[in-house]
């Protein structure tokens, strides 16, 4: 039965790390217990039969294939197609002849059906090129799907549709619904990661530029890594969930044996209990978060380093400097900052929460073991959102009632369910993704709240005794800053680069205005240019935005480009039947870009105004040093 040639070629093509599990299971499969097959005189006439009830997969394999091929003519421009069920594989082999189709992603629960299809057909070339991706049911989880959707590209999420291979797979309805829910959640997470508000992006850019003098006059992230990487094996990340309170006595006992990273909101709580963290982290840009540092703990702050994202609110810096706290500004990997050549001061992706940031820093500093405490990501039984002593507790009144039974998830330890929220669900899923691909061992010792998949659940006391009992007290080296001459040199380089980018932005805006006028003339019957010419000019604008030279604009324009262009996706994918259809589609395509270009112009104008003010502290710094 086995076509050695096809199967072996396909198996070799499943060579990537992601296929390790599937490849091994296919190699170990010695006999078919659930399914068999029949083949007619025609090579396309392959049917599959379930042994238990003799149910056929196809009533007529060739007729069903013809019907499917006719149906998928409307999907000729789609770069990605998703299917549940491998079937006999023939449909996919034919669809892959369309070079516009970049990937087919197949989800299959039955290992034997994957085995059969890989025997029937040679998919080796498409598997090697990644044009065909096979996902066995046992290997599907959130981190895996996150990786798949990153591979696909964001702008085609709106075209996502899970096609069922044929009626045979209706028996897997429950599995299909679960899978579809997982995929939709992954798409939603990716959209949220892009951000949906250019105002947030603008605030981040403005505050980053405003904070530049403080960044270059303090130690760099590179200095931190070079002096302190690998000094300690174990990091404890302290978050502010309701379960934190019960862990504080044990944390105090072992604080000198591990590196303590704490969230900005847990810092006042630790200070109150006399537990000194090594690092206090802050990620968010909002003014209200700065209030976590509006305090004075005197000598307690000695030797603590505050690791804050470079886009934090200016009040954060004021509070840190008021009490002479040591701090480092670390650049998030945003396009505007990356274009300034400040690699020594970055970069962190930071996830979406301060705990994600702390986790990334702990991993980058070489900790082999990372322990999470206070990471509930769920409401307490009494509806509390955070630990006792959380300074913003009043802002969460009514949250429990709002979210009740909407976002419930598996409890820590796997016993029952706990109530969560939409944002905590997203935070948990990001953590699960981080942990799944981390080189460190991650222990969740929260002993409450939600289960975080991939993290090892263990009592905090037991783990401290195992990992920390006989450890010596940690010792950290002091960090150095650039000398004044180097600070001025770097500051001048940044200043000139920002000014250059502001001029590029101004010229780009002028080009956008020209195209805006062309579209306006077209829609008002005054067009001097053909549809093709206007469309080419729109394409030139998009090409410039994808050029490395204009990468700095991706941050302010990113949310708008992502969301507006995802709305354009269905129009882009629409199949063209004839010349009239082509002209109608081209007109609709151009007209649909009018609001996008209008938004681009408005955002560039606002950014220019705000940058002129935000750059003043850097300008003042350089003028005082007589560099300008």
Where are these regions (language model features)?
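SAM cofactor-binding core of SAM-dependent methyltransferases
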Residues: 80-135
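Glycine-rich phosphate/pyrophosphate-binding loops
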Residues: 266-267, 274-284, 362-386
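Acidic, Ser/Thr-rich peripheral helices and adjacent loops at domain boundaries
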Residues: 123-127, 283-286, 294-302, 387-406, ...
């Amino acid at each position: 039965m086995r076509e050695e040639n096809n199967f072996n070629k396909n198996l070799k093509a499943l060579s990537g790390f992601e296929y390790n599990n599937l490849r091994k299971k296919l190699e170990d499969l010695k006999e078919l217990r659930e399914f068999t097959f029949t083949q007619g005189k025609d090579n396309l006439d392959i049917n599959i039969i379930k042994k238990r009830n003799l149910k056929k997969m196809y009533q007529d394999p060739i007729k069903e294939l013809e019907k499917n091929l006719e149906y998928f003519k409307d999907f000729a421009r789609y770069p990605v197609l998703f299917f549940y069920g491998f079937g006999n594989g023939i449909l996919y082999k034919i669809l892959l002849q369309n070079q516009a189709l970049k990937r087919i992603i197949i989800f299959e629960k039955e290992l034997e059906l994957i085995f059969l299809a890989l025997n029937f057909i040679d998919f080796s070339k498409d598997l090697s090129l990644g044009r065909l991706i096979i996902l066995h049911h046992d290997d599907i989880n959130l981190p895996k799907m996150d990786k798949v959707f990153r591979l696909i590209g964001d702008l085609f999420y709106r075209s996502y549709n899970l096609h069922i291979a044929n009626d045979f797979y209706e028996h897997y309805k429950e599995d299909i619904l679960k899978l579809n829910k997982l995929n939709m959640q992954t798409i939603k997470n990716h959209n949220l990661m892009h951000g949906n508000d250019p105002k947030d992006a603008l605030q981040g850019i403005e505050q980053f530029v405003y904070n530049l003098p403080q960044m270059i006059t303090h130690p760099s992230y590179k200095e931190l890594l070079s002096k302190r990487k690998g000094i300690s094996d174990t990091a404890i990340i302290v978050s502010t969930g309701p379960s934190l309170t019960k862990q504080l006595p044990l944390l105090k006992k072992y604080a000198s044996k591990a590196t303590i990273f704490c969230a900005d909101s847990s810092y006042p709580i630790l200070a109150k209990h006399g537990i000194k963290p090594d690092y206090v982290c802050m990620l968010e840009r909002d003014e209200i978060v700065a209030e976590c540092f509006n305090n004075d703990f005197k000598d307690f702050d000695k030797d603590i380093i505050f690791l804050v994202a470079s886009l934090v609110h200016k009040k954060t810096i004021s509070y840190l400097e008021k009490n002479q706290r040591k701090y480092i500004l670390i650049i998030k990997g945003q396009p505007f900052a990356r274009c300034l050549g400040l690699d020594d001061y970055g970069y962190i992706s930071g996830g979406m929460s301060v705990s994600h940031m702390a986790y990334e820093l702990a991993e980058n500093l070489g900790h082999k073991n990372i322990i999470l405490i206070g990471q509930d990501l769920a409401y307490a039984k009494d509806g509390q959102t955070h630990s006792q002593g959380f300074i913003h507790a009043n802002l969460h009144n009514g949250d429990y009632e709002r979210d009740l039974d909407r976002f419930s998830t598996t409890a820590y330890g796997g016993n029952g369910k706990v109530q969560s929220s939409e944002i905590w669900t997203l935070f948990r899923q990001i953590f699960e993704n981080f942990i799944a691909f981390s080189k460190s061992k991650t222990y969740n010792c929260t002993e409450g709240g939600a289960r975080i998949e991939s993290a090892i659940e263990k009592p905090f006391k037991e783990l401290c005794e195992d990992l920390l009992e006989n450890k010596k007290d940690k010792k950290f080296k002091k960090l150095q800053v650039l000398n004044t001459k180097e600070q001025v040199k770097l500051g001048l380089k940044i200043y000139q680069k920002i000014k250059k980018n502001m001029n590029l932005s101004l010229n780009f805006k002028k080009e956008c205005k020209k195209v805006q006028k062309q579209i306006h003339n077209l829609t008002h019957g005054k067009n001097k240019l053909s549809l093709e010419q206007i469309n080419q000019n729109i394409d030139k604008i998009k090409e410039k935005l994808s050029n490395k030279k204009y990468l700095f604009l991706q941050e302010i324009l990113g949310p708008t480009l992502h969301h507006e262009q995802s709305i354009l996706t269905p129009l882009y994918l629409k199949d063209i039947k004839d010349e009239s259809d082509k002209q109608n589609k081209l007109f609709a395509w151009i007209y649909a870009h009018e609001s996008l270009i209008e938004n681009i112009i408005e955002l560039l104008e606002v950014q220019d105004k705000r940058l002129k003010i935000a750059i003043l502290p850097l300008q003042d710094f350089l003028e005082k040093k007589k560099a300008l």
